[in-house]
């Protein structure tokens, strides 16, 4: 009888999280709001823009016997559908194109990171800040 009670208790405890909330414990991969610093070499200003980026949890696995078997591909939260918007930087000298484009995430998914189009993570040497004086982002095209 004690074994049956223990099994029932284990089942109830393991299902408790599903009753408490329908949301996952970790936020899944999805578009989120973000503020980016936009600047261009040759232009004396930096403008912040509000956009959406892909962020969130993607389930991954790793092998226990890594030396025997090849590594499993690791997935990251990355863009599925994206559009590009442009902003005009004031004060750029003649000969420097003042238009800068940036991505706006429309939808995201868990997939392999494409280094050709994405920052695949890892530690950063410096925070994402401006090198030039900052202006509010008011100059959209």
Swiss-Prot record:
Residues 1-20 form the signal peptide. Its main location: secreted. CDD domains: GHB_like. GO terms for biological process: G protein-coupled receptor signaling pathway. SUPFAM superfamilies: Cystine-knot cytokines. Transmembrane segments: none annotated. Coiled coil: none annotated. One of its GO terms (cellular component) is extracellular space. Disulfide bonds join 29-77, 43-92, 46-130, 54-108, 58-110, 113-120. Glycans are attached at residues 33, 50. Heterodimer of a common alpha chain and a unique beta chain which confers biological specificity to thyrotropin, lutropin, follitropin and gonadotropin. PANTHER family: CHORIOGONADOTROPIN SUBUNIT BETA 3-RELATED (PTHR11515:SF25), GLYCOPROTEIN HORMONE BETA CHAIN (PTHR11515). This is Lutropin subunit beta. It comes from Pongo pygmaeus.
């Amino acid at each position: 009888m004690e074994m049956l009670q223990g099994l029932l208790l284990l089942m109830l405890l393991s299902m408790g999280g599903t009753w408490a909330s329908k949301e996952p414990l970790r936020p899944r991969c999805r578009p989120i709001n973000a503020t980016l610093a936009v600047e261009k070499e040759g232009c004396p200003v930096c403008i912040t823009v509000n956009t959406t980026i892909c962020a969130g949890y993607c389930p991954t696995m790793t092998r226990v016997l890594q030396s025997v078997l090849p590594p499993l591909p690791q997935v990251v939260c990355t863009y599925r559908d994206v559009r590009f918007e442009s902003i005009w930087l004031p004060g750029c000298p003649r000969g420097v194109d003042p238009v800068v484009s940036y991505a706006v995430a429309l939808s995201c998914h868990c997939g392999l990171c494409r280094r050709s189009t994405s920052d695949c993570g890892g530690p950063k040497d410096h925070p994402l800040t401006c090198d030039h004086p900052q202006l509010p982002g008011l100059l959209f095209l």
